[in-house]
Amino acid sequence: MSVGFIGAGQLACALARGFTAAGVLSAHKIIASSPDMDLPTVSALRRMGVNLTRSNKDTVRHSDVLFLAVKPHIIPFILDEIGADVQERHIVVSCAAGVTISSVEKKLMAFQPAPKVIRCMTNTPVVVREGATVYATGTHALVEDGKLLEQLMSSVGFCTEVEEDLIDAITGLSGSGPAYAFMALDALADGGVKMGVPRRLAVRLGAQALLGAAKMLLDSEDHPGQLKDNVCSPGGATIHALHFLESGGFRSLLINAVEASCIRTRELQSMADQEKVSPAALKKTLLDRVKLESPTVSTLAPPSSGKLLTRNPAQGSKKE
């Protein structure tokens, strides 16, 4: 099996690092395309031994599982470019926030009648094999296609299938969740420093506290509120700290953050549907170079046989 990434940014880099660390894929079985070969993430992929190219079409030709790892507003343009190269063997996995299965299928069906599309939402902790991933399969994807993706993503953390209408909300929960945690850790460390704890130690202790709390929750059947209560002694320091958090609207802020991320995800889908790109986004993503077909760099591997090693499409069955 070979895996391709259209887009060589943070997500592609994290997944490639996770897959190789887990031992499920060798670096030479991975290819990523980017119009900009000077990106730090491209350099990191190169050091891993991942094949690199400027041509999105070459990425399609050299892969079986194809991850669309670009910004949502770029997806329609990418699909127009690569659609003619997508074959029956390909599993097209969209990782773009808000981009629906139907919108990807509609674009690809202009080139072939039954594209196999899966929508996926993961997060950056896949790099340390502690990711949180959900996916939903499209109209023409086989049951085996979903299981193959689940096997791949389970090697870098937790992965489960969900109904597609949950994915926008999950984007706000676990997709954006690591950013909330990093902000909280930064603030916790600042609090420690304010009270005299050295910065390095404050960061380590804060991170360990959150890691331990998460592991306690995952290893138990207790409600988070019960585990919180277990830390609070009557009249103690922790309950006073929690009262201060409550007075600042701590819970409401987190709830509203998940909601805001979910709403923005749906806005991004609307932009993608309209094939609308703001001037700032156009400049940032170098859209004119995304469509540029250039010769591949020297690390490009020879073409694969075009068949998945772990499944036989002829034996697959469509999802009921």
UniProtKB/Swiss-Prot annotation:
Q: Where does NADP(+) bind?
A: 6-11, 34, 56, 69-72, 95-97
Instruction: Provide GO CC annotations from the record.
Output: mitochondrion
Q: Does the keyword Acetylation apply?
A: yes
Name the domain of life: Eukaryota
Q: Where in the cell is it found?
A: Cytoplasm; Mitochondrion
Record has Transmembrane as a keyword:
no
Phosphoserine modification sites? S304
Q: Which reaction does it catalyse?
A: L-proline + NADP(+) = (S)-1-pyrroline-5-carboxylate + NADPH + 2 H(+); L-proline + NAD(+) = (S)-1-pyrroline-5-carboxylate + NADH + 2 H(+)
What top-level class of enzyme does the UniProt entry assign?
A: oxidoreductase
Name a biological process GO annotation. Answer: proline biosynthetic process
Into which family does the record put it? Answer: Belongs to the pyrroline-5-carboxylate reductase family.
Q: Please give the function described in this protein's UniProt entry.
A: Oxidoreductase that catalyzes the last step in proline biosynthesis, which corresponds to the reduction of pyrroline-5-carboxylate to L-proline using NAD(P)H. At physiologic concentrations, has higher specific activity in the presence of NADH. Involved in cellular response to oxidative stress. In some cell types, such as erythrocytes, its primary function may be the generation of NADP(+).
Supply the name of the protein.
Pyrroline-5-carboxylate reductase 2
> Could you tell me which species this protein originates from?
Mus musculus (Mouse)
Lineage summary: Eukaryota, Metazoa, Chordata, Craniata, Vertebrata
